[in-house]
Amino acid sequence: MSAAKNININLKIWRQKNASSKGSMETYKLDNVSTASSFLEMLDQLNEQLINERKEPIAFDHDCREGICGMCSLYINGRAHGPDTGITTCQLHMRMFNDGDTIYIEPWRSKAFPVIKDLVVDRTAFDRIQQAGGFVSVNTSGNTIDANSIPVPKDDADKAFEAAACIGCGACVATCKNGSAMLFVGAKVSQYALLPQGKVEATQRVLNMVRQMDEEGFGNCTNTGACEIECPKGISLENIARMNREFLKASLK
């Protein structure tokens, strides 16, 4: 890895006061950005500059800054989470850019993710889908079976863990030409469909989650595969196929 250096960049950033107001791209110039800094640290630096200039800082989502929570959600130069692969926005570093580059930064674009302010969008649609069926029933009467005593085939356990890696960032929706949430819902359905603990609500779970997904206004899946490519956790399209099978079985019962 080459030594860190400072670069000067131009930024085209979407600014919007709220969901009901019109937004536009605004231009900013930022100098002396270390290539060792993260993308969000670069935005912090820009906001410090704006505050010193007595201007409104840019609103953007972030929390853990470790690629775990799924809060950071920026469309950078036409790609969800930016030009690198297998990472979230907070894991993107400025060494991916060159001196003099112009960087375009936009919020997630989806009817189901309305803009709250600037680069922050409302992703509570995902929460409502999860609440519709993303859970398992647990006996709390005192006769609970130890989870470790329930055998799970190794292959099923591995696939369940892979599905559970979904952090709900919404990159799949943002990058999909149809604004589909099938990869997210497929991962959540698969996570429980593969485990014996998830069999209790299996039928109602997939029906409820798919119905809620449709009510939220997400688009249909046309198997383009962009969601899998841009997913920072590498969630496989196999989960969509599994959800479709679960939905068909549940619909026929």
Residues covered by each model-derived region:
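N-terminal mitochondrial targeting presequence
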Residues: M1-A4
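Eukaryote-biased recognition of intrinsically disordered, low-complexity regulatory segments
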Residues: N6-Y28
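Short strand-turn-strand beta-turns centered on an Asx-Gly dipeptide
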Residues: W14, L30-D31, I76-G78
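Short, contiguous acidic and Ser/Thr-rich linear segments
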Residues: E26-S38
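Ferredoxin-type iron-sulfur electron-transfer modules in oxidoreductases and energy-metabolism complexes
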Residues: S37-E56, Y104-K253
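Short, structured protein-protein interaction patches enriched in aromatics and acidic/basic residues
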Residues: A59-M71
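Glycine-rich phosphate/adenylate-binding loop and adjacent beta-alpha elements
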Residues: I76-G100, I105
